[in-house]
Design a protein with these regions (language model features):
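N-terminal, positively charged nucleic-acid-binding surface of large information/translation enzymes
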Residues: 1-210
Length: 210
């Protein structure tokens, strides 16, 4: 190639990096980026990654720390703290990233929002989005819908020996419908959650079948 963009998977902003992130994600990508710089010139290569600032693991990690009195700040503060720790770790391992930002941090966050909005708007204008109601877990005691990590039960897949099953997947990788989860419990209050309908937008993938 004459120009190249090398990317490394974006870690969640719920914690610092561990060695698996370094050895399994960033070192291989770094080796490839350095190889390309040697072959086509550093000015023609961009090695990019960053912190994923959204998702259930972040919400759940933040909630647990706040409830335990171990963090006093907003969820944005929590993510930014972990982002800075991640960046420091990558620098200490001399990972040669050109850009390490975040999907909701600073200018990169603004760009992420603009592109996401434009993308969704285009899909909507072309009729490729459909609004559908699906059942989701609701904690009547907490008065809130639960994200995937806030529900735990037993995996409904026959023969599965997973010790942790969440709203729609277990830690062994089995997927299932939320209503099939066995003996679900809310991690917020410990009560059995209700199933209530929630409307979301879905991409009309069948419209693109050949």
């Amino acid at each position: 190639p004459k120009r190249a963009v090398v990317t490394a998977g974006m870690p969640y902003g719920n914690k610092p990096l561990h060695f698996g992130h370094i050895a399994g994600v960033f070192v291989p990508a770094d080796c490839f980026a350095r190889f390309l710089r040697d072959r086509i010139g550093a000015e023609n290569v961009r090695f990019i990654s960053g912190t994923d600032c959204f998702g259930s693991p972040i919400n759940e990690g933040y909630r647990k720390l706040v409830e335990a009195g171990q963090f006093d700040g907003t969820i944005e503060d929590y993510v930014l703290r972990n982002h800075n720790r991640q960046k420091d770790t990558l620098d200490s391992y001399d990972i040669s990233l050109d850009i390490y930002e975040g999907s909701n941090i600073g200018h990169s966050g603004e760009v992420h929002q603009l592109i996401s909005e434009a993308f969704i708007k285009k899909l909507y204008e072309n009729g490729w989005l459909q609004k559908r109601a699906t059942l989701q877990f609701y904690d009547p005691e907490a008065g809130t819908f639960l994200n995937g990590r806030q529900v735990q039960g037993h995996c409904p897949v026959q023969g599965c020996k997973s010790e942790h099953a969440y709203a729609d997947e277990c830690d062994l990788g089995h997927s299932y419908a939320p209503e099939d989860l066995i003996a679900p419990k809310s991690s917020l209050t410990g009560v059995t959650p209700e199933m209530r309908p929630v409307e979301n937008w879905y991409f009309d993938l069948p419209a693109f079948n050949a």
